[in-house]
Amino acid sequence: MTKKICIAIDGPAAAGKSTVAKIVAKKLRFVYIDTGAMYRAVTYIALKNNIAYEDEKAIAALLQKTVIRFEPGEVQQVFVGSENVTEVIRSIEVTNHVSIVAAHPSIREALQERQQVFATEGGIVMDGRDIGTAVLPNAELKIFLLASVEERAERRYKENMAKGFTGDLDQLKKEIEERDHLDYTRTHSPLKKADDAIEVDTTSMSIDQVANKILSLAELKINN
């Protein structure tokens, strides 16, 4: 039987976390938990209910009454209550405001508690901004992915084009720099590399190369 370890993958926007985490989880037959999708879902419910993104108290009250769940599939499905929000939480509007919502301490605390419940039995791959430092500080394997702003903007641009969104590459660079600033400087659970995390610069690596590197590290932990 495969040892059920927890793998935490952190890093800034568009560093390739989700794509790599899905591959690693599938290969190991682990459960993938997309924490970014949870913050996006909260941002979406604020948008849907006409609540200002800065209104932490109102968003927190709404979150208390909201169930966010995942269902497996070729593309993991994300639900808010009974509504499938898999596509809408990737909209430009949500993408441009999720860092504001994610900076609210009460929102982070509420979602971190839910994320920790997901991980109680191990056998999970979880990606986000603060998994190795705040959500799963005892994870057996912690990875911190990096890539240049230019590379990340290029990746996001290609993603947007594939989804039919138009966009400006220079504008994407600016937005990523702004998200980095918000993520690294927020008071509660800022983005930072855990002391025991392994740093992987993905700038000149393919997705498969990154995934294979993490799988090799995971196998060492599983067989140790």
From Swiss-Prot:
One of its GO terms (molecular function) is (d)CMP kinase activity. Keywords: ATP-binding, Cytoplasm, Kinase, Nucleotide-binding, Transferase. ATP binds at G11, P12, A13, A14, A15, G16, K17, S18, T19. It is found in: Cytoplasm. Disulfide bonds: none annotated. It catalyses: CMP + ATP = CDP + ADP; dCMP + ATP = dCDP + ADP. GO terms for cellular component: cytosol. The keyword Transferase applies. Its EC number is 2.7.4.25. GO terms for biological process: nucleobase-containing small molecule interconversion; pyrimidine nucleotide metabolic process. The keyword Ribosomal protein does not apply. Belongs to the cytidylate kinase family. Type 1 subfamily. PANTHER family: CYTIDYLATE KINASE, CYTIDYLATE KINASE/PANTOATE-BETA-ALANINE LIGASE. HAMAP family: Cytidyl_kinase_type1. This is Cytidylate kinase. It comes from Listeria monocytogenes serovar 1/2a (strain ATCC BAA-679 / EGD-e). The lineage of its organism: Bacteria, Bacillati, Bacillota, Bacilli, Bacillales.
